[in-house]
């Protein structure tokens, strides 16, 4: 794998060079403006190309080190592209209204994520049929509301290591929170925006659908390149695989219904930190699709016991769950 290639022609065809009306400009963007045509500012793509490459390299390096990328784009024309790119690259996204404190008050947000998981479990299990129609509707509405806001980050397990933003004016709260926590920000910055405080500025049109689709595709491919590099460092030859790695149900008899991972998300956690887990037991857990503490922390007692039996340590598994919850909380 390698960083995604792109050309200036692609940027031109996507309309990346079109800024806003000249009277709406932010003077701090003057260095990135080529000129004006029909009272519309034209962005200097000769600067956009190297700056985009710099942002792509940062994304790839972050993921290669086991970091998380958070895509942020809540405007209508960015919502689908942001979600698709994040899912395709095994990253995370916010494409509905940004909740204040999503980053700076992660502990509270984690509580809401736990509630979302609880609702999904309640409505998806046999117990869900015990509720009246009205009760079930109320629970579904609560779940849907939480899913709109948190569905894209419910598996994140902690703060992101870099956020990628479409439209810095609209996502100013997200950017402020990231800056407060020292989280790098890569952003598409239009002619009406302020580039101050953005770690990786990419001058470009933040309104055109084709341009947004191009940005999201490039960032997603850079993240996939980072995953490939991380797996290469771990001795996994991605090119030799018969099919691309993807999350699917792990083959198991006793653990039927448990959804494992086909491979780690970034760098796998050291499961040998859990009491009684040797290298051999860790390999058995990996064979079941378990690579991270958060996976164990989320197990219900029945599934946890089945997994304990599968690896030959049923008496230890309750301790693993509590230890994993503690380790996950420490990471957050």
From Swiss-Prot:
It holds the Pfam family Ribosomal_S2. GO terms for biological process: translation. SUPFAM superfamilies: Ribosomal protein S2 (SSF52313). Transmembrane segments: none annotated. One of its GO terms (cellular component) is cytosolic small ribosomal subunit. Keywords: Ribonucleoprotein, Ribosomal protein. One of its GO terms (molecular function) is structural constituent of ribosome. The keyword Ribonucleoprotein applies. Gene3D superfamilies: Glucose-6-phosphate isomerase like protein, domain 1 (3.40.50.10490), Helix hairpin bin (1.10.287.610). PANTHER family: 30S RIBOSOMAL PROTEIN S2 PROKARYOTIC AND ORGANELLAR, SMALL RIBOSOMAL SUBUNIT PROTEIN US2M. Belongs to the universal ribosomal protein uS2 family. This is Small ribosomal subunit protein uS2. It comes from Afipia carboxidovorans (strain ATCC 49405 / DSM 1227 / KCTC 32145 / OM5). The lineage of its organism: Bacteria, Pseudomonadati, Pseudomonadota, Alphaproteobacteria, Hyphomicrobiales. The gene is rpsB.
């Amino acid at each position: 794998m390698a960083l995604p290639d792109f050309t200036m022609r692609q940027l031109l065809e996507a309309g990346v060079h079109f800024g806003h009306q000249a009277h709406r400009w932010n003077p701090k963007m003057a260095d990135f403006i080529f000129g004006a045509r029909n009272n519309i500012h034209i962005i200097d793509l000769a600067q956009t190309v190297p700056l985009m490459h710099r942002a792509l390299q940062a994304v790839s390096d972050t993921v290669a080190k086991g970091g998380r990328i958070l895509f942020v784009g809540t405007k209508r024309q960015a919502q689908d592209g942001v979600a698709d790119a994040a899912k395709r690259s095994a990253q995370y996204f916010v494409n509905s209204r940004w909740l204040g404190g999503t980053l700076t008050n992660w502990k509270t947000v984690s509580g809401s994520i736990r509630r979302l998981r609880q609702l999904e479990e309640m409505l998806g299990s046999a117990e869900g049929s015990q509720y009246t129609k009205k009760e079930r509707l109320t629970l579904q509405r609560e779940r849907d509301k939480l899913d709109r806001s948190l569905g894209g980050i419910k598996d994140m397990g902690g703060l992101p290591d870099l956020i990628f933003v479409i439209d810095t004016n609209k996502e100013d709260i997200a950017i402020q929170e990231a800056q407060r926590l020292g989280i790098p920000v890569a952003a598409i910055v239009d002619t009406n925006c302020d580039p101050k405080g953005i770690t990786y500025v990419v001058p470009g049109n933040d309104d055109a659908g084709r341009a947004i689709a191009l940005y999201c595709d490039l960032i997603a491919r850079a993240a996939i390149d980072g995953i490939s590099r991380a797996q290469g460092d771990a001795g996994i030859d991605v090119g030799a695989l018969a099919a691309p790695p993807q999350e699917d149900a792990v083959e198991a008899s006793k653990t039927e219904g448990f959804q494992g991972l086909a491979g780690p998300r970034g760098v796998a956690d050291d499961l040998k930190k859990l009491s009684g887990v040797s290298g051999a037991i860790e390999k058995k857990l990996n064979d079941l699709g378990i690579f991270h503490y958060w996976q164990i922390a989320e197990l219900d007692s029945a599934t946890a016991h089945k997994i304990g039996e599968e690896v030959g340590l049923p008496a230890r598994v309750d301790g693993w769950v509590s230890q994993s919850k503690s380790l996950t909380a420490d990471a957050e």
